[in-house]
Design a protein with these regions (language model features):
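Zinc-dependent metallopeptidase catalytic helix centered on the HExxH motif
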Residues: 1-47
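Short helix/loop segments within enzyme catalytic domains
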Residues: 36-57, 96-100
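Generic recognition of well-ordered alpha-helical segments
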Residues: 28-35, 52, 83-86, 121
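Solvent-exposed loop and edge beta-strand segments that line ligand/cofactor-binding
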Residues: 19-21, 68-74
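The feature captures the short pre-catalytic strand/loop hairpin that immediately precedes
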Residues: 56-70
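Amphipathic alpha-helical substructures
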Residues: 73-151, 155
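Beta-strand-rich binding/interaction modules
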Residues: 130-131, 151-202
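Short acidic/polar inter-strand loop motif in beta-rich domains
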Residues: 201-210
């Protein structure tokens, strides 16, 4: 019921020009289920719900389908919801996140849109260039993998299994303290007073310690 009601906003209010961009309908309405749980049962329960859907993501083809041939992409529901959940972590401010969701529906009120319009709107509101983020999650089938090592108090890290020049900030926990790192495809290092880190589970990413 929650999902279908969400289509009053993402489908009946905002719709796509080409079915290849069907994620604009299904990803947002799937994530509305998570927002419902967040409101009624709390953040932890909502996170458990959306993270629990990851086992059903196939990553067999990109979320955006080929244009002009009446074909949609794959994983529009569960991968799309996790894409949006990850974006919410990057925004790190639920007021901004609500403004984005409401703003999409006012900015594109009763319009047909393409993915680029949605991307540009969200990037402008979050204040971070999300070009490679969207290219990775919408147009590639790989999930970003944080490759890292810890030696002599130095954390060295980079993104692998990603498109060229991919960049995305990530929150990690070190000795109970949350800190931001800004990985790219090139190795970076910071000093930490621990031999382990914990990656925020709300990001739809993988990690490997080397």
């Amino acid at each position: 019921i929650i999902h279908e009601a969400g289509h009053e906003w993402f489908a009946n209010n905002i719709t796509y020009k080409d079915i290849a961009d069907m994620w604009v309908h299904e990803s947002f309405t799937t994530y509305s289920e998570n927002l419902f749980l967040d409101y009624h049962y709390g953040n932890e329960a909502a996170s458990d719900y959306v993270i629990g859907t990851r086992d059903g993501i196939s990553n067999s083809s990109p979320m955006i389908g080929p244009y002009g041939v009446n074909k949609r992409g794959s994983d529009l529901y569960t991968k799309g919801a996790n894409l949006l959940h990850t974006l919410r972590q990057i925004a790190k401010d639920d007021e901004i996140w609500r403004m984005i969701l409401r703003g999409l529906n006012s900015e594109f009120y009763h319009q047909t849109v393409d993915t680029k319009q949605i991307e540009e709107f969200i990037s402008s509101k979050i204040g971070f260039d999300l070009t490679t983020f969207f290219d990775q999650y919408l147009r590639d089938i790989r999930i970003p993998n944080l490759e890292y090592s810890i030696s002599d108090g130095l954390l060295t890290y980079r993104w692998v299994d990603v498109i060229d020049n991919f960049t995305m900030p990530l929150e990690i926990e070190v000795l109970g303290e949350n800190i931001w790192i800004y990985p790219t495809t090139k190795k970076k290092s910071i000093e930490i007073n621990s031999d382990r880190i914990k990656i925020d589970r709300d990001y739809y990413v993988k990690s490997v310690k080397i």
